[in-house]
Amino acid sequence: VLEQTSKRGISVAGILLVPPTGDAGTLLKHPDFNGIAPYTMPNMTTIESTNCYAAALDFLAERYSDPNMRIAHWIIHNEVDGGSHWTNMGDKPIATFMDTYLRSMRMCYNIAHQYDQHSEVFISFSHGWNIAAGGGWYKVRDMLDFMNQFSESEGDFFWSLACHSYPAQLGNPCTWDDEQATYSMDTEYVTLKNLEVLDKWVSLSSNKYKGTVKR
């Protein structure tokens, strides 16, 4: 498939998921993983587990930097605002979760850029902008604020947004009727109705990479 997309000039995004099972599960599974979620936050609490994760990233980054089978965009884990349901590391305060998540993202960015200076990393999130989209979930806008804070204090790097812009009510596809999706930055949800909110967010200088480049 990747050979065909490369021939046709199609840009490909890969989603980095860490299942807690398998031979590598013992090393890669976060020690506070709840045992229920389909994916785990990678374990970066020991040197051995961190090296294992870095080795996996290095293998993927080198392999898929080949122009004939290139992955240009790396989406780091799935809907991380729903860490309790998807990329799990136990029940953690948002600051603790985001500190760990950003380390995973930064590691992927640094390793991928050894092989492809034009590769990009993305934070994956659902439609809950100023509201938790599920029980025990985080608010996306709060998570992005932490991304900015950590990037500013630890050194900025270019990360981007990968939004799953579902309808406000998942069972109702009539997204144009979403009353909880407004054009305000304080909207509860970002859906197909109000994607302009994301453009507003990335256009603010305080949210740009080094204050100048849209994420």
For every predicted segment, state its role.
Residues 1-132, 168:
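Substrate-binding cleft and catalytic face of glycoside hydrolase catalytic domains
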Residues 96-215:
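Noncatalytic carbohydrate-binding groove/subsite architecture in carbohydrate-active enzymes
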